[in-house]
Amino acid sequence: MNMIQRFMQSMAKTRGLCHPDCVKASSEQEDYDASQLSIWWIMLGRKTTREKWMNQALSSLSKTCISIWWKMSGIRGKMCREREQPLTVKDCLECAFKKGLPRREHWAHVGCTFKAPPFACHIPRVPMKGEVIETKSLDEAFKLLIKQPVGARLHVFSPDLDNVGEGVYEGLSSLSRKESRYVGLRDVIIVAVNKSEGKTVATVKICYKKKTSFVKVCLSRMFVQLGGGEESQVKEPTGLLVDFCIPRLSIN
């Protein structure tokens, strides 16, 4: 048995487990970039009839492997150094289409901080064919939503988002303006758009502070300042949801 075979065998024995150092680091982390989860919410979401054939292949993949595969591919470190920005759903989707993804049994944890094993590049992967469709327009995002859930990024203010509960999230509220702080953009998936309390709202699924939840987001709220200071200014009025995208899977 060669080294690669022994490596694959050892992974099969430890499926579903993660390195203790990674578990400890994760438990100490207040929040994390959930783009790795968002990609799977989108790709495992509703499919058109033309794409139903993908269900079986996608179900064999793990939503927990994308960040590890990104690290293995060597793309993550290079892109983060060049851009000095966190990965987005679009980045992860493009990596999936370009490199393929490992299967469920090969990785156990999203965002594993433990060093990738030396033979990680030999892990078998499921090929993915398709392209990433982007739009900046909310109207175009609504059209995409007819066929499947849409990925987006949400401007997050704390404690406004923490305290929204069953209400409608409107970003920085006047009641908590003094104690609010701008956290940044977080990846979400838009699952529905409807009326609530007389407002047009989007229901989004979000991973925030290690919790997955559904939040109603006001679509009519616009602002030009995210918080205090010049760095918080945006170039033009913006809504709470931005950077919409979906994967278009190909059968060719």
Swiss-Prot record:
Keywords: Cytoplasm, Nucleus. It is found in: Cytoplasm; Nucleus. Expressed ubiquitously, including in seedlings, leaves, stems, inflorescences and siliques. Induction: Target of TAS1 (trans-acting siRNA precursor 1)-derived small interfering RNAs in response to temperature variations, thus reducing both basal and acquired thermotolerance. Up-regulated by cold (at 4 degrees Celsius). Repressed by trans-acting small interfering RNA (ta-siRNAs) siR850/siRNA255-mediated transcript cleavage. Highly up-regulated in seedlings exposed to heat shock. Induced by HSFA1s-mediated (e.g. HSFA1A, HSFA1B, and HSFA1D) promoter activation. GO terms for cellular component: cytoplasm; nucleus. One of its GO terms (biological process) is heat acclimation. Mediates both basal and acquired thermotolerance via HSFA1s-directed pathways (e.g. HSFA1A, HSFA1B, and HSFA1D). Triggers the expression of HSFA1A and HSFA1B. Belongs to the heat induced plant HTT protein family. This is Protein HEAT-INDUCED TAS1 TARGET 2. It comes from Arabidopsis thaliana (Mouse-ear cress). The gene is HTT2.
